[in-house]
Curated annotation (Swiss-Prot):
Isomerase found in the keyword field: no
KO phenotype (gene knockout): Null mice exhibits aberrant expression of brain area-specific genes and structural organization in the somatosensory and caudal motor cortices. In somatosensory cortex, vibrissal barrels display postsynaptic disorganization. In caudal motor cortex, anomalous differentiation of corticospinal motor neurons is observed, accompanied by failure of corticospinal tract formation. Mice also develop self-inflicted skin lesions and show significantly enhanced scratching responses to pruritic agents, due to the selective loss of a subset of spinal cord inhibitory interneurons.
GO molecular function, one term: protein dimerization activity
Compositional bias segments (type: Gly residues): 81-90, 185-207
Entry superkingdom: Eukaryota
Record-linked Pfam families: HLH (PF00010)
Highest classification ranks of the organism: Eukaryota, Metazoa, Chordata, Craniata, Vertebrata
Domain bHLH: 216-270
InterPro entries in alphabetical order: bHLH_dom, bHLH_transcription_factors, HLH_DNA-bd_sf
Role this protein plays: Inhibits DNA binding of TCF3/E47 homodimers and TCF3 (E47)/NEUROD1 heterodimers and acts as a strong repressor of Neurod1 and Myod-responsive genes, probably by heterodimerization with class a basic helix-loop-helix factors. Despite the presence of an intact basic domain, does not bind to DNA. In the brain, may function as an area-specific transcription factor that regulates the postmitotic acquisition of area identities and elucidate the genetic hierarchy between progenitors and postmitotic neurons driving neocortical arealization.
Tissues in which the protein is found: Brain-specific, with the highest expression in the cerebellum.
Any GO BP: retina morphogenesis in camera-type eye
Protein name: Class E basic helix-loop-helix protein 22
Length: 355
């Protein structure tokens, strides 16, 4: 019984090894084609350097060696069976694949199959999808170079080369932006940034200069207005000094309007007094031809003149008129001038000129 079990286990291990060898041959071809041939649109210049395999390695298991130096990839149990911790810890890493104790890709449905068979099934599905998407003409077999592993590598390392032209245009724009940033020293500012900043600085300088000019003009206007007001006040003070009733001790200082009104009334009064003086001089000039019969008429004229202006009451001559009808006018001329002693001597000019 035990011998039969040992023979059955040995036969199963031999079948598993044969299946794994056949899988290794086909997988090696696909992996080599995927890593050696660069599809259009894929740039491997930024990809991490791969470790070179020794040329003497002709084992079909060489394709399962780790392709990246960091060992990124997941573990594959060795082809000899050995479950438990020895099967999980002693495997080799395959980039982009997940093969463990739970099956391929973490699927429990494939955990009952041997590792090689599960891997073969997974590769078959991926190859079918990749061949339909990337075929340029005719049908491709699952053993062809275009498999799902290349798609996984491209998606992990860079953008998909089968993307739309719109996405390609976007990447070209990004590259152009990066080149512009390098050309401008990596400052991140647009080319017109410093120029626009200088223009704003120049505008600020112009506005400050304009404000200074306006301030100087305003100061000049204020100074001129101050001088004008000072001159006006001085002129009004001189006018108050001339007006008789403006500088009295009992009268407070008049305002500007009151000073101007008082000056107007004083000028009108002086004009009226001058007119009365002219009438009196005309009357004196006509007195040489006056007779005794004309005395009442002259007295009436003097009364009318006194009624016009009270100041002329001192010049009233009706009561004590010094002239008489029988006296010559030459004898009465000095007496007439003596009555008007307050008037200037030019009024009696005719008395001094006559013999």
């Amino acid at each position: 019984m035990e011998r039969g079990l040992h023979l059955g286990a040995a036969a199963a291990s031999e079948d598993d090894l044969f299946l794994h060898k056949s899988l290794g041959t086909s997988a090696a071809k696909r992996l080599e084609a995927a890593f050696r041939s660069t599809p259009p649109g894929m740039d491997l210049s930024l990809a991490p350097p791969t470790r070179e395999r020794p040329a003497s390695s002709s084992s079909p298991l060489g394709c399962f060696e780790p392709a990246d130096p960091e060992g990124a990839g997941l573990r594959l149990p060795p082809p000899g069976g050995g479950g438990g911790a020895s099967g999980g810890g002693g495997g080799v890493s395959v980039p982009g694949l997940l093969v463990g104790s739970a099956g391929v890709g973490g699927e429990p449905s494939l955990s009952s199959l041997p590792a090689g068979a599960a891997l073969c099934l997974k590769y078959g599905e991926s190859a079918g999808r990749g061949s339909v998407a990337e075929s340029s003409g005719g049908e491709q077999s699952p053993d062809d170079d275009s498999d799902g592993l290349c798609e996984l590598v491209l998606r992990a390392g860079g953008p998909d080369p089968r993307a739309s032209p719109r996405a390609g245009g976007g990447s070209a724009k990004v590259a152009e932006g990066c080149s512009n940033a390098h050309l401008h020293g990596g400052s991140g500012l647009p080319p017109g940034g410093p120029t626009s900043g200088g223009g704003s600085g120049g505008g600020g300088g112009g506005s400050s200069k304009k404000s200074k000019e306006q301030k100087a003009l305003r100061l000049n206007i204020n100074a001129r207005e101050r001088r004008r007001m000072h001159d006006l006040n001085d002129a009004l003070d001189e006018l108050r000094a001339v007006i008789p009733y403006a500088h009295s001790p009992s009268v407070r200082k008049l305002s500007k309007i009151a000073t101007l009104l008082l000056a107007k009334n004083y000028i009108l009064m002086q004009a009226q007094a001058l007119e009365e003086m002219r009438r009196l001089v005309a009357y004196l000039n006509q007195g040489q031809a006056i007779s005794a019969a004309s005395l009442p008429s002259s007295a009436a004229a003097a009364a009318a003149a006194a009624a016009l202006h009270p100041a002329l009451g001192a010049y009233e001559q009706a009561a004590g008129y010094p002239f008489s009808a029988g006296l010559p006018p030459a004898a009465s001329c000095p007496e007439k001038c003596a009555l008007f002693n307050s008037v200037s001597s030019s009024l009696c000019k005719q008395c001094t000129e006559k013999p």
